[in-house]
Amino acid sequence: MSEAKDFLRDLLDQVRAGDSYGQLDRFSDSQLLAPFVVTKEQRRTIATNCDLDIATAARLRSFYQAVAAATEKATGAFTTTILDLNSEGFGRVIIFAGRLVVLDNALRDVQRFGFNSSEELAARGEALVLGASKLIERWSEVARDDS
């Protein structure tokens, strides 16, 4: 459970890092994580035939940047996140470590991005970090290549 809490801490760090004016300082950690929890009923009410909401795109970016940050902490390999989304909610996220692609996910219907619970959020984040870390361990020469 400690690793899950570590991921949630990394996620909160990313959310707060995107707040250049300090508007989120008044919110608790649980309030900042609440938008990441979207129940199945809530998900059904979200239309996918409209433009992507800026807040949803920011949450998606924060999540994958937290995965990259946690991977970097776990392995010491410098990571870079690339998120490409179109206005309709389709796109791709790629996380690199050196020259190694450690995560490559196709995204669709991101208007409905969220998790059923904060535990599921933490578990998904940790699973992605673990998978990326294993790739970096296996291909460490490529992951640490900065040329």
Swiss-Prot record:
Listed GO biological process terms: nitrogen fixation
Pfam family, one: DUF269
InterPro entries xrefs: NifX-assoc_nitrogen_fix
Swiss-Prot/TrEMBL keywords: Nitrogen fixation
Superkingdom of origin: Bacteria
Protein family (similarity comment): Belongs to the UPF0460 family.
Record protein name field: UPF0460 protein in nifX-nifW intergenic region
